[in-house]
């Protein structure tokens, strides 16, 4: 168990991370640097796992950052130990498969929503699907996640009352 401060990086671009992380308390965001701008592509909350996809699946350096947005309580497991558990324990292997399926579906839904919904509809879905997160996360990160500017998000918020 690790108690880690806000702004601590669990993974960084170019670093081969050797752990997967479980968030007991706190939240994180995963982001990329694109043309010098931070683009948030994921939030992880209590009960979620987070990790560098490249490190977990290919044992290569990561292409994204995972930053804690709050003081957090994190458990870590070395990736080789996790892989051994998958190989030797069918219940854990199935649990891991289900987690990965859920994440894949969330990612696919997000991509489809970015392509097919208006900015207002994306924001409304985000609020209803992530109650309370708006009070925990910087609005700029949410705007980036939803594929809009912070100014556009602020204008939408002024027009919408939940």
Question: Which role does the model predict for each range below?
Answer:
Residues 23, 44-45, 69, 77:
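A conserved hydrophobic position in a structured secondary element of the catalytic/binding core
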Residues 117-162:
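Phosphate-/nucleic-acid-contacting segments
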Residues 27-32, 48-49, 73-74:
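Short beta-strand segments in beta-sandwich/barrel cores
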Residues 35-50:
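Short acidic-glycine-tyrosine-enriched beta hairpin
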Residues 38, 57-80, 91:
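Ligand-binding loop in jelly-roll beta-barrel domains
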Residues 9, 29, 50-52, 61-64, ...:
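Histidine-centered metal-chelating micro-motifs
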Residues 62, 81-118, 122:
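A small-molecule sensor/coupling module
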Residues 1-21, 25:
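Regulatory nucleotide-sensing modules
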């Amino acid at each position: 168990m690790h108690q880690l401060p806000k702004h601590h990086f669990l993974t960084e671009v170019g670093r081969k991370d050797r752990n997967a992380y479980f968030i007991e308390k706190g939240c994180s965001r995963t982001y990329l640097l694109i043309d010098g701008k931070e683009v948030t592509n994921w939030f992880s909350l209590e009960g979620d796992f987070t990790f560098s996809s490249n490190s977990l699946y290919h044992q290569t350096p990561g292409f994204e950052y995972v930053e804690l947005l709050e003081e957090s309580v994190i458990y870590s497991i070395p990736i080789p130990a996790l892989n051994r558990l998958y190989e030797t324990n069918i219940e854990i292997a199935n649990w891991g498969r289900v987690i990965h399926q859920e994440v894949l579906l969330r990612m696919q839904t997000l991509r489809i929503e970015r392509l097919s919904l208006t900015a207002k509809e994306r924001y409304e879905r985000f609020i209803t699907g992530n109650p309370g997160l708006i009070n925990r996360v910087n609005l700029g990160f949410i705007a980036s996640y939803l594929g809009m500017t912070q100014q556009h998000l602020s204008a939408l918020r002024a027009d919408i009352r939940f």
